[in-house]
Design a protein with these regions (language model features):
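ATP-binding/phosphotransfer module of carbohydrate and carboxylate kinases, centering on a glycine-rich
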Residues: 1-53, 170-338
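Active-site glycine-centered loops adjacent to acidic/histidine catalytic or metal-binding residues
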Residues: 6, 99, 134
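Short, surface-exposed beta-strand-loop junctions and turns on beta-sheet-rich folds
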Residues: 20-22, 111, 145-148
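Short beta-strand-loop/turn "lid" adjacent to the catalytic site in phosphate-handling enzymes
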Residues: 49-96, 101-114, 130, 264, ...
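Short coil/turn connectors at secondary-structure junctions
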Residues: 90-92, 124-128, 261-262, 310-311
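Glycine-rich phosphate-binding loop of actin/hexokinase-like ATP-binding domains
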Residues: 115-120, 124-185, 276, 286-308
């Protein structure tokens, strides 16, 4: 039995998984509101209870950088240490890793039913790039070399945003006036979509429907923008989503080139599901157009367009994939100790 956690600024998922023939089955899963707890240890104590569990290993995917066995969560006042968790809960092996790094470990375990293909490309064994846009932007990769596969830890979402057009240069100038340094995450995330909308509203003007104004003032403004774009009630929202999709595709293409991802690009995070799978109820025509805009940005790489045309592009549909990846990493770490 393996304990796995997906630790985020909003919620923390904790699960017990069993490994069966290379695949993982979730035996038990609980979700905790992260901000209602003072630490991960408090959540684990509530999950495990007063007894003990026959655990082979534990894997913790966390929303933040992991350095020297220690993680500081980006949007929580938590500090997590692998050795401390091992001692407190008597865990024989602990794998502490970034959440998107954990997501990358899950890629090889996902069946076809849990993946949506945007571009089939050519199926070859090679590096795999992972890009996950949600509350923030995370990137990772599965790197294959000399018969060995490893998942790459990265904070690439905080690298510089590179504008590709005059409109994006204006967006960059707008964001620089707010933030100084403009990372890709400032654009390619839920808050980034809101910023794009604010930029376009300021430059184009026009009235917004009252329900949208109310939605933008709520706790979920990005979701309100997506809804308005899908139902055609706001030109500014539609333009914001169009611009966002092109930038998303461009960054996925950049990461594919940086990692030589001949094995494919996998998209995670809630935004890919909302915009490219159209889980919010958009028409098939809207979804097809969204995919076309994404792929236009993805493929627009000059001399390397032919290479990117051969790269499969897929969306991860399984919300539990980060848990599966954390469990897989923990299992590998446990086997290495034997």
């Amino acid at each position: 039995m393996i304990l796995a956690c997906d630790v985020g600024g909003t919620k923390t998922n904790v699960a017990l998984l069993e490994s069966r023939g290379g695949a993982f089955e979730i035996v038990r899963l609980e979700t905790f509101q992260s901000r209602e707890h003072d630490s991960l240890e408090e959540i684990l104590a509530a999950f495990i209870g007063s007894g003990t569990l026959p655990l082979e290993a534990a894997g913790f995917g966390v929303a933040g950088p992991v350095i020297g066995g220690r993680a500081i969560i980006t949007n929580l006042p938590w500090q997590i240490e692998a050795l401390q968790l091992a001692d407190r809960f008597r865990l024989p092996t602990v794998a502490l890793l970034n959440d998107v790094e954990a997501l990358a470990w899950a890629v090889d375990s996902l069946p076809d039913a849990e993946i949506l293909t945007l571009q089939p490309g050519l199926s070859v064994v090679g590096n795999v790039a992972v890009v996950a846009a949600g509350t923030g932007l995370g990137v990772s990769a599965l790197v294959r070399s000399a018969g060995i596969t490893v998942s790459l830890a990265s904070e690439g979402g905080h690298a510089d945003f590179a504008a590709r057009s005059n409109l994006e240069v204006d967006l960059l100038t707008f964001l620089r006036s707010r933030h100084g340094h403009v990372s890709v995450e400032r654009v390619l995330s839920g808050p980034g979509l809101v910023s794009i909308h604010e930029f376009l509203r300021g430059s184009e003007g026009g009235d917004e429907p009252e329900w949208l104004v109310s939605g933008l003032r709520s706790g979920h403004p990005a979701a309100a923008i997506v809804r308005a774009a899908m139902n055609g009630s706001s030109q500014a929202c539609a333009r914001a989503v169009d611009l966002f999709l092109g930038i998303y595709g461009a960054e996925a293409g950049n990461w594919a080139l940086r990692t030589l991802a001949t094995g494919g690009v996998f998209l995670g995070g809630g935004i890919a599901a909302k915009l490219l799978v159209a889980s919010s109820g958009a028409s098939e025509a809207w979804r097809r157009r969204a995919i076309d805009l994404f792929l236009l940005g993805f493929l627009e790489k000059g001399r390397f367009r032919p290479m990117l045309e051969r790269v499969p592009v897929r969306v991860i549909l399984n919300d539990s994939a980060p848990l599966i990846g954390a469990a897989r990493c923990a299992e590998i770490a446990s086997a290495a100790r034997r």
